[in-house]
Swiss-Prot record:
Residues that, per the record, bind ATP: 94, 96-97, 117, 129-130, 180, 187, 266
Source species: Clostridium perfringens (strain ATCC 13124 / DSM 756 / JCM 1290 / NCIMB 6125 / NCTC 8237 / Type A)
Lineage: Bacteria, Bacillati, Bacillota, Clostridia, Eubacteriales
Residues of the active site: 256
UniProt keyword list: ATP-binding, Magnesium, Manganese, Metal-binding, Nucleotide-binding, Nucleotidyltransferase, Transferase
Binding site for Mg(2+): 257, 266
Protein name listed in UniProt: Protein nucleotidyltransferase YdiU
Class of this enzyme: transferase
Molecular function, one GO term: ATP binding
UniProt keyword Protein biosynthesis, yes or no: no
Function: Nucleotidyltransferase involved in the post-translational modification of proteins. It can catalyze the addition of adenosine monophosphate (AMP) or uridine monophosphate (UMP) to a protein, resulting in modifications known as AMPylation and UMPylation.
Reactions accelerated catalytically: L-seryl-[protein] + ATP = 3-O-(5'-adenylyl)-L-seryl-[protein] + diphosphate; L-threonyl-[protein] + ATP = 3-O-(5'-adenylyl)-L-threonyl-[protein] + diphosphate; L-tyrosyl-[protein] + ATP = O-(5'-adenylyl)-L-tyrosyl-[protein] + diphosphate; L-histidyl-[protein] + UTP = N(tele)-(5'-uridylyl)-L-histidyl-[protein] + diphosphate
Family named by the database record: Belongs to the SELO family.
């Protein structure tokens, strides 16, 4: 089947412009394939958004694509090369178990990578087997869809296939392949790789390609590389604020896990915070709390500093001048983050305007929440509904004092109760992908029962809907002596 007939049958409008880059950025390779695959999850709503033929792809025809048994006609699959600072240590990486099948271009000219994850060893696999386990792939599916529902830029999951094979981790697990959709997979680590092992022309080619793909409005600007740096800084500031506002903890913010597009990527040891504590860490390998909830803005800044270092030769031929430009641009991150953060927190508290003491009001609430170990999500739900139950924080003197200050501040807005509540409901999710719910979904799914997972996914499509039907997903996990721990399974 040629590309034209394939497009007509599936809806996939395929290209691979990444192949126009110098060949140090990729390695051509076909997926290994699966002997006895089964399509266990297909994202019909995403397929519809992308203009794909759901009926064809949610069949044996689609299964063969998602299982790595068939590739897109006329398109060469590639593994992408990149580096990364892993917990601060620079190393060569690359797609060790993923392949970019191609790029799908929608009818409104939006371009998306179509990537198989868990499709076998590549030239960049090092000691890995190139495979993926079922539970981590389903975990990425659930949480990425949850993030999308929350309105947070993210990669998406189109399909999950059970390969019919076992993979050895700490124990034997069911093998799987996830089909990931992303605006692109160009990472901070891709630029670090180009700066370290490529030529100046390689670096320039990558930057020009990325600008054309993600920031076409600056492509013809005289100072396009400086503007490029500033655009990426701005997108990351916006993204991290959105993470913080819902208690999302990525867990492994290495430079290979920060993409230039500003999407959330790689849902390995991520989790959502229940009890508000800025020191919260879930990852089993984050012993020092480098990627703790409260440190995520600092780590984003650190990653962006590495990005600016990679761009230095493009910012100015004179190194000293280039460093000064980079420093000036990077210094804006904290200002942008602070601005976006307090704007978001005002919205979460029903405030439409900016007043001098708002920062003290916001910080006063958060410090009280931390002191009394309040649930992050449900505290803001309680404030939204003006309904205070089951939390010791609400009976504290600190909260009562804060509440009076907040009410006085709301009066200054001259807005109706309905307007205030609508603003709060649109910024305070009623539900999130709570860790215990995700774990229950995965446990059942591994046994072949997808009922709870499907119901959870349906609920997460509308997390800002304060519906009675969603109330069961607001319940906190039972108290446990064992802390919740996540692993880098994805």
């Amino acid at each position: 089947m040629d590309n034209k007939n394939f497009q007509s049958k599936t809806g996939f409008n395929l290209e691979n412009t990444y192949l126009t880059l110098p060949n140090i950025f990729f390695s051509e390779q076909n997926p290994k394939g699966s002997k006895n695959p089964k399509l266990i999850k297909f994202n019909t709503s995403l397929a519809e958004e992308l203009g794909l033929n759901e009926e064809v792809l949610n069949s044996d025809f689609g299964l063969n694509i998602f299982a790595g048994n068939e590739t897109f006609p006329g398109i060469v699959p590639i593994a992408q090369a990149y580096a990364g600072h892993q917990f601060g240590h620079f190393t060569m990486l690359g797609d060790g178990r993923a392949l970019l099948l191609g790029e799908h271009v929608t009818k409104d000219s939006k371009r998306y990578d179509v990537q198989l994850k868990g499709s076998g060893r590549t030239i960049y696999s090092r000691g890995g087997d190139g495979k993926a386990a079922l539970a981590p792939m389903l975990r990425e599916y659930i949480i990425s869809e949850g993030m999308h529902g929350l309105g947070i830029p993210t990669t998406r999951s189109l399909a999950v296939v059970n390969t019919g094979e076992e993979v050895l981790r700490e124990r034997f697990e069911q093998g799987a392949i996830l089909t990931r959709i992303a605006s692109s997979h160009i990472r901070v680590g891709t630029f670090a790789y180009a700066a370290q092992w490529g030529t100046l022309e390689d670096l320039k080619s990558l930057a020009d390609y990325t600008i054309k793909r993600h920031f076409p409005n600056i492509a013809k600007s005289e100072n396009k590389y400086i503007l490029f740096l500033e655009e990426v800084i701005n997108r990351q500031a916006e993204l991290i604020v959105k993470w913080q506002s819902v208690g999302f903890i990525h867990g492994v913010m290495n430079t290979d896990n920060m993409v230039i597009s500003g999407e959330t990527i790689d849902y390995g040891p991520c989790a959502f915070m229940d009890t508000y504590d800025t020191n919260t860490v879930f990852s089993s390998i984050d012993y020092a709390g480098r990627y703790a909830y409260g440190n995520q803005p600092n780590m984003a800044l650190w990653n962006l500093a590495r990005f600016s270092e990679a761009l230095l030769p493009l910012l100015n031929p004179n190194l000293d001048e280039a460093v000064n430009i980079a420093k000036k641009s990077i210094s804006n991150f904290s200002k942008l983050y602070k601005k976006y953060w307090f704007n978001k927190m005002r919205a979460k508290l029903g405030l439409f305007t900016e007043k001098e003491n708002d920062e003290l009001l916001i910080e006063g609430l958060l410090s009280t929440m931390q002191k009394y170990e309040a649930d992050f999500t449900n505290t803001f739900v309680s404030l939204t509904l003006n309904k205070f139950e089951d939390e010791k924080v609400f009976s504290s003197d600190e909260f009562k004092t804060w509440y009076a200050l907040w009410q006085n501040r709301l009066k200054e807005e001259n807005r109706s109760q309905e307007e205030v509540r609508n603003l709060m409901m649109n910024n305070n999710p009623y539900i999130i992908p709570r860790n215990h719910l995700v774990e229950k979904a995965l446990k059942n799914a591994e046994k072949g029962d997808f009922t709870f997972m499907d119901n959870l996914l349906e609920a997460l499509k509308n997390p800002y809907s304060y519906s009675k039907d969603l109330e069961k997903y607001t319940k906190l996990p039972e108290k446990s002596d064992t802390p919740y721990v996540t692993y880098c399974g994805t």
